Amino acid sequence: MSLGGGGQQQLQQLSQEIQAIEEEVEELEADVASLRQEQTEIEEAKEALDVLETGATVQVPLGGDAYVRAEVKDMDEVVVSLGGGYAAEQDSDAAASVLDEKKATIDGRIDDVQAEIADLSEEAEQLEQQAQQAQQQMMQQQMQAQQQPQDGEQ
C-alpha cells in the first residue's frame, strides 16, 4: 500500500519539521535544567551568607570532587562574581543583593525559555495535526482509487 508521491513528500517534510522542533525543545529543556542548577547554587550561596560566621570551618572545593577544610577569616567582606570574569569584594548585604539580582535574572530567563518551549510545543502539535489530516486524505484517495476499478467490474 503506497501513498501518493506528493503526499508522501508533504508527510516527510512535516515529520522533519516536527523532529527539528522536538530537538530544539530538548535543547531548551536542558537549558532550563542548567538555569535551575544556577538558581540552586545562588540559593545555597545566600543561605551560606546568612549562616556562616567568622571562625566557622567550611569545605572549599578544589575541583575533581576534592575538598579542603578552611576557616572563615572574615565574613564582613565577601567576594562576589559580577560576570564577565570580574569579581568585587562587598559586604554581606551587598553580596546578598547581587545574588538576588542574579536569581531574578535567571528567573526571567527560565520564564522566557519555558514560554518558548510552550510556543514550540504548540507549533509541533499543529504540525502533527496537519500530518494526520494529510495522511487521512491520502488514505481516502487511495481507497477511492482501489474501489473505482471494482465498481466498473460490476
From Swiss-Prot:
Main location: cytoplasm
Stated name of the protein: Prefoldin subunit alpha
GO molecular function terms noted in the UniProt entry: unfolded protein binding
Function: Molecular chaperone capable of stabilizing a range of proteins. Seems to fulfill an ATP-independent, HSP70-like function in archaeal de novo protein folding.
Pfam families registered for this protein in UniProt: Prefoldin
Family membership noted in the UniProt record: Belongs to the prefoldin subunit alpha family.
Keyword Cytoplasm attributed: yes
Keyword annotations from UniProtKB, A to Z: Chaperone, Cytoplasm
GO biological process terms, semicolon-separated: protein folding
Organism whose genome encodes this protein: Halobacterium salinarum (strain ATCC 700922 / JCM 11081 / NRC-1) (Halobacterium halobium)
Subunit structure: Heterohexamer of two alpha and four beta subunits.
